[in-house]
Amino acid sequence: MDDWKPSPLIKPFGARKKRSWYLTWKYKLTNQRALRRFCQTGAVLFLLVTVIVNIKLILDTRRAISEASEDLEPEQDYDEALGRLEPPRRIGSGPRRVLDVEVYSSRSKVYVAVDGTTVLEDEAQEQGRGIHVIVLNQATGHVMAKRVFDTYSPHEDEAMVLFLNMVAPGRVLICTVKDEGSFHLKDTAKALLRSLGSQAGPALGWRDTWAFVGRKGGPVLGEKHSKSPALSSWGDPVLLKTDVPLSSAEEAECHWADTELNRRRRRFCSKVEGYGSVCSCKDPTPIEFSPDPLPDNKVLNVPVAVIAGNRPNYLYRMLRSLLSAQGVSPQMITVFIDGYYEEPMDVVALFGLRGIQHTPISIKNARVSQHYKASLTATFNLFPEAKFAVVLEEDLDIAVDFFSFLSQSIHLLEEDDSLYCISAWNDQGYEHTAEDPALLYRVETMPGLGWVLRKSLYKEELEPKWPTPEKLWDWDMWMRMPEQRRGRECIIPDVSRSYHFGIVGLNMNGYFHEAYFKKHKFNTVPGVQLRNVDSLKKDAYEVEVHRLLSEAEVLDHSKNPCEDSFLPDTEGHTYVAFIRMEKDDDFTTWTQLAKCLRIWDLDVRGNHRGLWRLFRKKNHFLVVGVPASPYSMKKPPSITPIFLESPPKEEGGPGAAEQT
């Protein structure tokens, strides 16, 4: 090994140097940046290609739509039809003077668009049946009114005629039918449609579809109609497209004197339609009233709560009658609106009244119940010194002597703990069963429909246990329950001081109103002096009832009480009849008697300890339930109480009217 020498061809061995960490990081970072730039460049190129392709596709599609739009058939499906619609056309760069209007009518859906904006779309099941009407301002194109009239049901055509007659000339009218709109479309309504220039409207048949656009008092701007081929089917959907030329602002406005009242009127009339002469340019109806003051007005400082929803035309009618009543105090009136609806608040502002809106709670009848609770609580918070509150609803006419009636009777609530309320409504007070506007009764039921509530009753008893939102109860039925009423009674007049005119509501329709509300008697005589008011106190009333029964002539019980001859053809007499009533809740005979007397018969109302009081042929007619009533002692021994048996229930009988 001593003679070993390294080879000159091999490099000497040395330790390998490690690369710097900085150079390694810089190398990797350079590679990542290059990759990112590459990806970004690719993405930009991809987007450019996509944009070019889409532009070409849009141009080709518009060309195809333009060629096909003239051939659009009314029977096409709604979605297909909308897919082929042109976008709203624009004329130049200045203000537009033409509206693009599209109207769709079919069995299950209606639709209206103005310049591409949907102003009506209704496809809810079992709702919105009938003729939908929209009113546009002829100068601006904004929606001034939206209504639906269920002209399948009775009297809705009358409401439509009234509304259309209230619309000012020149306004743009749009009509469209959902489901069925002809069944109760009578000649008067058809004649009105004919006067508007419609050709198809007056000939509208069973389950036809129809769309119409025109000016009131001006030309028809478009109309389409499809007849139903058979009773079991509907007309094809129709889709109407038309241009509506706009008028000048000068033509659409009135030039009233610049007063505070007219400024309110101008704000109202520029926004909404369907209120008739209140917006007349030449002779507008007053919006301020000056009824005579009421001498010794006991209700001058009693707050009035008007319970309202989204029925502005009802509210308008109701407030006009309320503000015209003798003794009214406008500063004591508050309108409570269930929901943030604009038009009802416009009506309130028109009359210069206080309006309060709140968020709806719950659904259906529970929503109404919560609305009442919130409104009553707010009323006593607004007027903490008030002992009472008057409760009204938006669909009531108020008699001219409404406050006079309350002023003469409200002391009874303070002096008689056996009383529950004072109501302006007589459930049994029909045109043929009510006669004396000066006469008062005590009844065990709570009629509502214009009534006075004692604050102590509400705060101490009703408010703490008011039905909660999850309970779908009617507030008035709950108040009538024995647990709330606790044997107390209400004071009512023989002739009502309120009239229920509303035919659209949660528990109301045309059939129901026709049968039970339309023919109620309503006092129109001012200044009625109530008779023997203090005799309505608990003990005094018993004396009065016994006096009446002692003087009454007993009718011939062998006759049929449902026949007109049951009562003699006299006037001014008092008669009594005795009917079978085995116990306090046995109302079999009374219910059948109420049916043949054509008065309220759905449940028992208007009674006092088994006694009913009404008028027949201008005679005071008393009915006593035997033996349940304590007044049975007045029955002569020879008289057998009348018994009317309930008819057998029919199995499979017709139910309530449903969507056609």
Curated annotation (Swiss-Prot):
Q: Does the keyword Signal apply?
A: no
Q: Where does UDP-N-acetyl-alpha-D-glucosamine bind?
A: I307, A308, G309, N310, R311, D338, H371, E394, D395, L506, N507
One GO cellular component, as annotated: Golgi membrane
Membrane topology term: Single-pass type II membrane protein
Native source organism of the sequence: Bos taurus
Origin: domain of life:
Eukaryota
The cofactors it requires, by name, are: Mn(2+)
Where does the record place the modification Phosphoserine?
A: S7
Q: Which residues bind a carbohydrate?
A: R129, D179, R207
Co-factor binding comment: The manganese ion interacts primarily with the substrate UDP-N-acetylglucosamine.
Localisation per UniProt entry: Golgi apparatus membrane
Coiled coil ranges (UniProt) are: none
Q: Where is this region: Interaction with O-glycosylated substrate glycoprotein?
A: 473-481, 506-512, 600-605
The residues that cross the membrane are: 38-58
Q: Which PANTHER family match?
A: PROTEIN O-LINKED-MANNOSE BETA-1,2-N-ACETYLGLUCOSAMINYLTRANSFERASE 1
- Topological domains, Lumenal: 59-660
Those parts of the protein on the Cytoplasmic side are: 1-37
Q: Does Cytoplasm appear among the keywords?
A: no
Protein name as it appears in the record = Protein O-linked-mannose beta-1,2-N-acetylglucosaminyltransferase 1
This molecule's function is given as: Participates in O-mannosyl glycosylation by catalyzing the addition of N-acetylglucosamine to O-linked mannose on glycoproteins. Catalyzes the synthesis of the GlcNAc(beta1-2)Man(alpha1-)O-Ser/Thr moiety on alpha-dystroglycan and other O-mannosylated proteins, providing the necessary basis for the addition of further carbohydrate moieties. Is specific for alpha linked terminal mannose.
